[in-house]
Amino acid sequence: MLLAYTVRPSNWSFTRRAYSATARAFNQQKGLLPLPIKETVDMAYDLHLPERSVIGKMPYHSPEPIIFYHGLLGSKRNYRHDCKKLATALQTPVYTVDIRNHGSSEHALPFDYNTLVNDLVHFAETHSLGKVNLVGYSLGAKVAMLACLKHPERFSAACIIDNSPEEQPHIKPLLTALVKSCVKLLDHHNVRADDKLWRHKASEALKKYIPDAGIRYYLLSNIINNPRVVEYRSPVINYDDGMLHFKNPVRHMMDFVTKEVAAWPTQELEGKQFLGPVNFIKATRSDFINPKSLQAINQYFPYHNIDEINATHFILNERPQEYLRAVTDFFKVTRYQLEKKREQDLAKIDQLNASESLKSARD
């Protein structure tokens, strides 16, 4: 029997601190209730264990589990079936998490890449996971890359799905449109939660801004129309007002998508590399990974592989079997090929250093 455990944070104690000037000014301008400030949050998660284990009963803390990190406006629920398959195919536990301001996790500031990396490290430490493998998609992919570069001792390997380690001003319009369309749905279309046609009306409202039906379906998966099923009650969302709401504090997230989502801390990461194996899955009809991205990928991740799949950026929804096969093949085969190449390169360096030392001693 396949096992899955769901855990939600409860009884959070909020750290009361002054907001950053940017966040405070933005919230005041929009007349928003303030989000609490927390350096780290305990992310909600699902734990998926293999359906059939070749080693009998799988221990809870198996070596090198996988943490699956979703994208902007995603959640662990979107990929629970995929992660169940991964757990069985790879015979390892797979944790799917909700990042802050998503799914069942706490709504809090700051909401930036460094904070999301801190949440990830906090999660691994809290659950005593040791070294782990990462699978990240879109926003989650950028967090995974940053985590590997800033904390290489904590991560063994990573699978990066359609994102690259660089500044990406060209992706900002798409991601801004996603969040802005959600805000417009709430602010300009009074769809009641008890309306039997709420899903159709919400989809039609989003259609004005998001013509792609698949993307609208992705966004609609975040809507709450029944306050009794809310797993986390946000301090800035009134679930009992009879209207539709998103699981995300989308109004508060606009500052992130306009200023942070396309960023990359080039200066902070100068000279840093992650020497573990990394697999990039590129969607061929997406520009999140483009020819110019290869230089940055080579710079930060010298032991990498790139798989290509015919899809748009929403590759997980469009090509689930193909991307799962690519992830599985990487962790089963390609990662070990890359590790072997790394060991060969290190052996050559050691040999050269030994030769230089011997030559110096003779001189």
Swiss-Prot record:
Residue numbers annotated as active site: 138 (charge relay system), 162 (charge relay system), 313 (charge relay system)
Residue interval of the organelle targeting sequence: 1-19
EC identifiers of the protein: 2.3.1.268, 3.1.2.1, 3.1.1.-
Keyword field: Hydrolase, Mitochondrion, Transferase, Transit peptide
Catalytic activity reported: ethanol + acetyl-CoA = ethyl acetate + CoA; acetyl-CoA + H2O = acetate + CoA + H(+); ethyl acetate + H2O = ethanol + acetate + H(+)
SUPFAM superfamilies given in the database record: alpha/beta-Hydrolases
GO CC, one annotated term: mitochondrion
Protein family (similarity comment): Belongs to the AB hydrolase superfamily.
Name of this protein: Ethanol acetyltransferase 1
